[in-house]
Amino acid sequence: KKKIKKVIFISTMAVYGQPKTRIVNEKTKTSKTTNYASIKLKQENLLKKFIKNYQCQITILRLPGVVGRNSNKNFLSQIALSIKKNKIITFGNPESYFNNLIFSEDLAKIIFKISKNNKKYKYNVYNLGSSKPEKLGKIVNIICRFFRFKNKVVIRKTHKSFYINIKKFEKDYFKLNTTLSSLNKFNKSNSK
């Protein structure tokens, strides 16, 4: 029988709900605002209990919007889809900073690196995102320019936004790609 040595669990930034702080880190209070967030938190807690009885390493990765070719369940993918269908783009908080994305290939590298680590911990949570947050309005403008979008862009009032503190992961592993680098990869992957 082989023993399980490592578990890498894919969770979500949705576990924070609508944070009251502008910057979210691993110590930010979680919130079960959606069924999805509630299920992910229950799974995280089950894994925390699991390690009490077993000798293995558990790493929780709380993911932002994962972008790449054919991604569709996140904010940036919805904008790209609206552009391709020549629909009006609507978004809020153009002056807020945004790094709530990670390119799918970069995520694969992260998982591989964690699977090969020799670090001494039993349970660890990491928020992922891109480094060097950029203003959301700038990000939307870059996407619109890349796809030569000339239709209407509507800015609406929305709840306060946040950006992700990724310092813990970068301290323990490696520097993550910048927001602009991830956005560039996303644009190129969706131009085909």
Residue ranges, per PLM feature:
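NAD(P)-dependent short-chain dehydrogenase/reductase
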Residues: 45-99, 104, 108, 143
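Short glycine-/acidic-enriched loop or helix-start segments at secondary-structure transitions
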Residues: 18-20, 70-72, 137-139
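Conserved Rossmann-fold NAD(P)-dependent oxidoreductase catalytic core, especially the SDR/UDP-sugar
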Residues: 1-35
